[in-house]
Each structure stands twice: as structure tokens, then as C-alpha cells.
Amino acid sequence: MQKELSKKNKIKNKNHCRIFTMENLLCLLIIICPILDVSSFIFRNFFNTNFSISTFVRPIIPIVAITYIFFKDKIKPQIIIAGIAYLGYAICHVYIFYKIKTGCAYGNELREIQYLVNYTFMVMNLFIYIYFFAVKNREKEITQQTVGKSLEKVKKAVLIALTIYIALMYLALITKTSSFTYGETQVGYKGWFESGNSIGTIMLLSLFIVLPMLNKENKLAIRIWVLMITVLVGAYLCTLLGTRTGLFGFIIVVMAYIAFTVLYNLLNKNKLNKKILTIGVIILVLVGIAVTIFGSKTIERRRELKNKENEIYDTMTNQTAHVTGDTVELVKKIKAGQMDENYMSESMQQAYLDLYNTANEKQISNTNMRTLQLIYHSNLIKEQNSIPMLLFGNGYMSHYYEMIFEMEVPAFLFNFGVIGFFLYFIPFLIIAVYGIYVILKKFRVVKVEFAMALSGLWFAIIISFLSGYTFFNSSTMMIIIALSVIVINQIKDIDDNEVKIYNPEKGNDTL
């Protein structure tokens, strides 16, 4: 009797150990992202602060994970070298920020450090997830013929997180407590989240992971779940969010999934999967009906911007301005010699003059902020003519609030310098570029899941260049990291020919 009890206790202890694994904790970090986002929004608005509880909660699991890796694996020197590199860069960057900051700066040293910490954790999380989901358990899973088991946890974690996101969004809409995507004009709805652009990007990138779960290998309950969530997400993104990314992005994701599925069947001379085509068409039709009945906040936003464009007047030319009203006033002061260099440096003043002249010459819309910001920062780099700033950046928060870069890829290069660009952005770009190389070389054995994940990664890079709110958002980065891990795993499957090794009958969704 006692032996049986001791056996049962051992089994229970093993089960508990299996539950509290690093892989499960990392999946939990993905699942709680929507809860952390909502808590951040409520905390910041209630206490009117830039900090929140989630600022301190998010790093806990990654710190535990990196500590585990440091003491359990034989890569201590590499971790120490990487830590020194990122710390050294941060010190140089903050020092430059401190030296060049003027009165017009939108943030102080603490805010700048906050961005550096977020980006460092972003790269650290990428390493952690690759280590646990693409390296550590791989040999064991191959031996046990369970390759991809831990990765399935990541995909299901993304599905659960997406479900929570859309559930919270509709709850905010039903209770009429949703905030507006564009608060100044009360257009679009973003629920209890900080940014409409970021919540839209999170949902779109999640769909790149979730939609391939419609294949026959998953249980019927999972497929129904995915279908319902996709329709709800599509209805929200296309009718209620109010951003072009949401409206056109959803159509791109669904069409990409249909295209990859059809392409596979054509390449492998299989019958077209009519169910997939039917599901895709149904999703697009349902969303189209929703847009027709309820209208689209995106279209409303475009009309509002067009009206706003005609309202901004340039008193120096007596015509509609091609820059913002604030920029017109700043340029007037600069031309009149009334701008204090303690408020705005000489190089910034010249960059504003160049921006004003270029915008008028090219007839740029005064509401096209991203183009105006790109012109300003390009001119500022030329005017500063500084090697240290070129290498370590001229600061993200050191500019007048209108010129804080929304386009993240150029921001990495201009505001964080060439070294910052390599430290924070290049790791993701390498994965994306190598994924393209593998697909072009071995496209006949590429799974639809791989094609979708790689498309999602490139979609994130393109969106971060065009609209922003991608790499600068902690929760969005978790989905990008999940996409990266899927891509790496799929590449390893192809390179090692493991599809046949661990399951020769599997692979009915390859391109």
C-alpha cells in the first residue's frame, strides 16, 4: 500500500515538474500579454504616469530564463560578451543623448533608457525562445519522434492570447468603455489598449500563426475555434479599428493563406483543398458584409484627414501648408532669428528649414507625418555631421514631439545609430532573409506553416517601416519572436530532412 502511494506521489511530482517547465512559462508570457497591455493602459491613465505594473512584471520570466541558461549551459562567455556589448552601447547612447538634449526634447534620459531596456529585452527574448524551442529540446524530440511538440505550445499560446485580445476588445465595445483609436477626432475604437496601430498589428501577426491551424491535422474543435476568432478579428480590423493596416492587412493575411494552400496543391499535383478555399471566401464575404452594413472607420479616418489637411494654413505663403501648424510657427521663429539654441540646436533648426523647403517643393500633404519625419531626420543627420552620432544615434526622444520617428526601421538607423541598428534590428532581418533563401532553394518541401510564418515576419518588417508601432511594442514583439521561432524550426526541419524522419506520412500541407 505504501509503495503504491509513493509511486502515485512520484507521478504527481513528475506531472508538476512537467507543468512548471521553462517552455510552459515562456508560453504563459505570450498568453498574459493582453492582460499586461490592459493593466498598463488602466494604470497609466489612472495615475498619469509612463510606468506601470507590467513594466516590472514582463521582465521576470525572461530574467529567470536567461539565468537558467547561464548556469545550466556552457555558453557563459558568449552571454557575458553579449551583455557587455549591449551595456557598452547603451552607456554611449545615453551619454550622447545627455550631451545633445535641448529644451524641445520630448523625453529625458530615463525615457531614453526605458526604450533601450525594452529593445535589449526584445533581443534577449529572441535568444531565449530560440534556445528553448529550436535548440534545447530538439534532439530529445527527434529521438522520441515528437518533433514540433513544444512548438505546438507556442502556437496554441498565440491562439489563446489572440482570443483574449478580441474578447477584451468586444467587451470594451459592448460596455461602451472603449477608448478611441484617434482621440482628437474620436474615430475608431482600440478598447482598453494604448495604441490602435499596435493592437491591429498584434492581431494581424497572430493570424499568420493561427490560420495554418485550420489544416486537417488539428482537431475539429481547434479548427472551429480558429475560424470563429478569425471572423471576429476580421470584423473588428476592417470596420471598427480605423487604420489602413487593419483593413488591408486582414485581406492580405487571408489571401496569403489561400494562395499558399493553392500553390502547394499545384506544385504537388494534388487536388485543390476546396474546404480551405471555401473557408477563406466565407471569411472575406462575412467581413465584406460587416463593412457594408456598419461602414469602415478607416474610410471615415481618411475623410477626416483630408478635411484636416485643408484647415492648416501657412501664414508665410498665404496658402494651404505642406507641413504641420507647429512646424510653420517654428520655421517662422527660426527665420526671424528668435529661436533659442538652448531650446533647439542649430542643426535641428537647419533641419526644420530644409524640411519646410522640401515639403513645399514636393507638395507633401501636411497630414503625411511619416514622410515629414523621414525628411527631417535625413536632413538632421547631414547637419549634425557627427561620427559618434552616426554610430550610436542622436537619441529617440531628443526631438520635438512631432518629429519622434514613427517609422521604426529608419528610427533604429537614425536615432540609435549604425551600431544600434545592428544590435536591435539585424537579428530579425537575418532570420527573414535566410528564410527567403531557403524557400527559393527548396520551395517544393516548404510547408504552408513556414510560408505563412515567414510572410508574417516580413509583414512585420514592412509595417514597421511604413507605419510603426511594431518593434516598439513589447506585446507585438512577442508575436514577432514566435514567428521567428517557427521559421527557424521549419528551416531545421528542411535542412535535416526531419519531416520524413519523425513522421513520414506528415507533410500534406507543403508547398
Give short role names for the model-derived ranges.
Residues Q2-F71, Y89-T102:
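N-terminal signal-anchor transmembrane segment
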Residues L25-I31, V226-L232, F416, A432-S467:
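Loop-to-helix entry and N-terminal half of a specific, functionally important transmembrane alpha helix
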Residues L26, A82-Y86, Y129-Y170, K219, ...:
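Interfacial loop-to-transmembrane-helix boundary motif in multi-pass membrane proteins
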Residues C27, V254, A453-S464, T470-L511:
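Transmembrane alpha-helices of multi-pass inner-membrane enzymes
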Residues S54-I61, I84-I91, C104-N137:
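Aromatic-anchored transmembrane helix interface
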Residues L151-S179, G196-N265:
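Alpha-helical transmembrane segments of multi-pass inner-membrane proteins
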Residues K190, Y343-I419, I439:
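Long extracytoplasmic/lumenal interhelical loops at the membrane interface
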Residues T261-N357, K382-Q384:
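A membrane-periplasm/extracellular boundary helix in multi-pass inner-membrane enzymes
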